[in-house]
């Protein structure tokens, strides 16, 4: 069957770079203008899109015609007007916890940067204020994840990925 059934708003290069075989029946669109999406969706049953853009508002959803399902490529799917989709009988799906490990690792990196004032130190050193930065950071003492108590609000995919990583640093995790 060479008919196109799915339209991907994710670039074809994302599929190619990951080494996955691109199935037949999948077309790609790099133009996120509402008119272009509506036109490319003619005869399409499913729409595959990035989690945060483009915005699928009630007007655009009504113009999607034969589309029955919208799948986002991440946990977030607030770029789709869910009330309008429900009225049109569209199924909207996300990929929960898809990026949970990436986000958990980013959180740990951000916590360490904040604890050690790395952004401040970087800027101070670049502007020639090394002595002041050194005095400020060393003056307040060591700040470590080891022995710290860290609270996690919510144990969804990200929280569940974050907890053992924090524990590996020797932190006590409270959720």
Regions found by a protein language model. Name each.
Residues 1-51:
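N-terminal glycine-/charge-rich "phosphate-binding" loop or analogous flexible N-terminal tail
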Residues 8, 150-152:
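Hydrophobic Val/Ile/Leu positions in short beta-strands of Rossmann-like dinucleotide-binding domains
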Residues 50, 73-74, 90-101:
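Short beta->alpha connector loops at strand-helix junctions that form conserved
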Residues 167-175:
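NAD(P)-binding Rossmann-fold cofactor-contacting core
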């Amino acid at each position: 069957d060479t008919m196109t059934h799915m339209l991907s708003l994710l670039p074809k290069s994302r599929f190619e770079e990951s080494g996955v075989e691109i199935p037949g029946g999948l077309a790609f669109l790099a133009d996120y203008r509402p008119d272009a999406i509506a036109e490319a969706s003619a005869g399409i049953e499913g729409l595959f899109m990035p989690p945060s853009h483009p915005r699928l508002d009630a007007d655009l959803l009504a113009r999607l015609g034969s589309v029955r399902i919208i799948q986002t490529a991440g946990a977030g799917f607030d770029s789709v007007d869910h009330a309008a989709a429900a009225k049109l009988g569209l199924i909207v799906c996300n990929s929960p916890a898809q990026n949970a490990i990436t986000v958990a690792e980013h959180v740990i990196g951000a916590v360490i940067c904040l604890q050690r004032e790395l952004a401040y130190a970087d800027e101070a050193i670049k502007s020639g204020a090394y002595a002041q930065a050194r005095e400020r950071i060393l003056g307040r003492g060591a700040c470590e994840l080891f022995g710290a108590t860290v609270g996690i609000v919510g144990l969804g995919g990200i929280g569940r990925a974050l907890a053992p990583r924090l524990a590996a640093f020797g932190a006590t995790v409270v959720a």
